Amino acid sequence: MKVKLVLAGVVIATALTTIACSVRPASTDEALINPDMGWCFYKYSNRAWAYGINTPTEDTLDWFPGCSTMYMRLTWNDLEPEEGDLRWEIFDTYAQPWIAKGKKVAIRVMTCSQVEEGTPEFVRMAGAKGHWFTYPKKTSGLDFPPRWEPVYDDPIFLAKFENFLKAMAARYDGDPNVAFIDIGSLGIYGEGNPRPDYPLSDEERAEQGGRNPDCYPPAWKTRLSKLHIDLWRRHFPRTQLICLDGFDGGWNPEPDGEMMRYCRANGIGFRDDSIFTFPPPEKNKFRPYDSWCHDNWARLFAPTQPVVVETCHYPYRARTGQWDNEKYLKCVEKYQASYLSIHDFPKEHLESCRATIDKINKRLGYRFELREVTYPDTVKTGEKVEIVSTWVNVGVAWQVKGAALAWSLVDAKGNVAWTMVDNRFDFKTLDPTLDDVERPQTVKTPCRFGFTKKVSEPDNVVVWAREAGRKFPDTVVMLKPGAYTLCVSVGSRQGTPAIALPLEGQVGQTRRYAVGRIEIQP
């Protein structure tokens, strides 16, 4: 470990001279795998083959820097082709290797797609209302067959879909291996936008008044959005849900949306799909930036909820000239993204965009740098001391779930001998670095290393143990005197490390990082 020791001062404490050592650890450039952030590998992207068909089941993309999550987006029809015949193994088989590595999975279930049927046939046969649409050839250049879109508030459709959600929730709600679930039951691809020829009542048509519902959501669209948001909220109260901007109009020019406010109030995160898909800005007055629309909405979510960004399908847009690697990084900055898609075959994407991916990994999500730590080099057992550390979040996002700072003493064998957790400081308060402005925080952690106590007497158990020939000292010493490595970690309130830091000196694979040495004296 490369550390720089600086003599910072001398403190006299109860007949023991303590030297305060200051260390400024060097930060590394490594890509980190951390909770609630990272790259998403698309095992399924509306299609069973895209983009995991060439990736073996056991391949968890450890070679793709920063890839933390496997994303699976399939139709309801894939998962329940016949009523009650639930094909969860389509998810679970591929999830297992990722879970075994400590990585996560994410899910979206769609009810409408132009590629194949989204809603199972048994729903239509039961009498659910809907309409057939043909995806326009001018959009894709292909002749798609007609597909069926449900009427999203039809009672039969809702009853059948809610039965499916109950079964899905029984399996996945509250599962710590699930990073997030998209609310994906409204609109084509689950993006919240019903087709332009979606059947409306006379009253709903009057509400719309000739306006584009993708720009200015009428009352019927808002009602459907809230209906489906609440449907998922009801069944997944213990899961991080994500809502797409299209639920409030994918081209809505307003600074905020009614459904976006509703989602923030109910702990639902934000997602924007298909960055780089759109025409240049001079052809669309509603988009404030070159290649996306709602980074302003994303920034309203970022302080408290995760933001997920999906790019367009890279192979096509790279050919049409709409892909821009500089904007690839810029969209992460503008959206303050926690998650970013690999919307391509991952190996080829890494080869094509490696330099930009490396830059993104230094900014995506949160990234905690320890800039300086000051600690006493010698401490008496149980003595009150203070460790002062300065931290900077050099990422673009907050660590919204919260995390605690811990200082541990590790012995020569690599065993954790003592751990102190700072219960006053929470890393979710560490603001990200935006527009090159760092917001460091200095944390003063009160510590006591070790605990010594005389064995209480009289005590029947003590008498019985000694009469039986058991030998033990008169004093309980919970931390033996001697030299220890001082390690820092970020994780649970109990001191369990959870977050990787860009530091050298990790003790094994524990996510504890050595910063110096402390001598414990009796």
Give the positions of each predicted feature.
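Extracellular/luminal regions of secreted and cell-surface proteins that mediate adhesion/ECM remodeling
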Residues: 358-522
